[in-house]
Swiss-Prot record:
One gap junction consists of a cluster of closely packed pairs of transmembrane channels, the connexons, through which materials of low MW diffuse from one cell to a neighboring cell. It is found in: Cell membrane; Cell junction, Gap junction. Belongs to the connexin family. Alpha-type (group II) subfamily. Residues 2-13, 100-148, 227-282 are cytoplasmic. Expressed equally in incompetent and competent ovaries. The keyword Transmembrane helix applies. It comes from the Eukaryota. Gene3D superfamilies: Gap junction channel protein cysteine-rich domain (1.20.1440.80). This is Gap junction Cx32.7 protein.
Length: 282
């Protein structure tokens, strides 16, 4: 199935921009959900409607009873579930690629600024932002906007996972019965319908359900881990910004100039010995 290969390539790209727990979540998604759905579930549910037999010859009765027992096929339901829980991850990948592109352009501007004279280059470096998400090794640092985006995508995954688990329970429960009783029109009376291989199908249902709960648990653990990490970084920044409240002398306060004023003096005023002496005094 080509759509699975495309989804696999996209999620493999996301893996390089995720936490360790996020990489484990992707492994669970690939091995315990997509792989089982591709190899086992398709074969087991290949005969679901053809082998759904009812003890009546009334035309249309079997189709109506099958629709009542299974409003949506299990395989298609799990397919929608995997697509839904993977979509927030793909949206996060789009944000990461946007940040990488923006900081790549920023690095190119800084490289052009480096060709200017040293004094002007010093002030321009202070005026522009420096890349803070991409490391020298090319990896992404999950912080700031990326951290918020990562947390949002985790919350969306958790909500979608819970909704699909609850939806599966209300649609057809977590086990399959051998016999289904149907009284829908156009069935002439109470009709007994029988399902093929209910035990084997119930085993796969429980397997996919356990995989969904493991995925939900990993998302909750990852969300807790990121919240603790963000709290520690916030406390560390507060300690770094804490300074001793010492009032500077009056002369130092009068002679203080902002970086913008110094830059304007360097640009507008011609170089002279008096200006040089003033700058040395500052």
């Amino acid at each position: 199935m080509g759509e699975w290969d495309l989804l696999g390539r996209l999620l493999d790209k996301v893996q390089s921009h995720s936490t360790v727990i996020g990489k484990v979540w992707l492994t669970v998604l690939f091995v315990f959900r997509i792989l089982v759905l591709r190899t086992g579930a398709d074969r087991v549910w290949g005969d679901e409607q053809s082998d759904f037999v009812c003890n009546t010859q009334q035309p249309g009765c079997e189709n109506v009873c099958y629709d009542l027992a299974f409003p949506i096929s299990h395989v298609r339901f799990w397919f929608l579930q995997i697509i839904a829980v993977a979509t927030p991850k793909l949206l996060y990948l789009g944000h990461v690629l946007h940040v990488i592109h923006a900081e790549k352009k920023m690095k190119e501007r800084m490289k052009k600024q480096a060709e200017l004279d040293d004094q002007t280059n010093l002030f321009l470096r202070k005026a522009y932002k420096v890349p803070k998400y991409t490391k020298s090794s090319g990896k992404i640092s999950i912080r700031g906007r990326l951290l918020r985006s990562y947390v949002y995508h985790l919350v969306a995954k958790i909500i979608l996972e819970v909704l699909f688990i609850v939806g599966q329970y209300f649609l057809y429960g977590f086990t399959l019965d051998t016999r289904y009783v149907c009284t829908r029109f156009p069935c002439p009376h109470k009709v007994d319908c029988f399902l093929s291989r209910p035990t084997e199908k119930s085993v796969i249902i429980w397997f996919m359900l356990v995989a969904a709960f493991v995925s939900l648990f990993l998302s909750l653990v990852e969300l807790f881990y990121l919240c603790v990490k963000a709290a520690k970084e916030c406390m560390a920044r507060r300690q770094d910004y804490t300074v001793t409240p010492v009032t500077p002398p009056l002369l130092a306060r009068k002679s203080f100039k902002s970086h913008k004023e110094v830059f304007q003096n360097c640009v507008n005023e011609p170089a002279s010995p008096e200006n040089n002496m003033e700058e040395v005094h500052i």
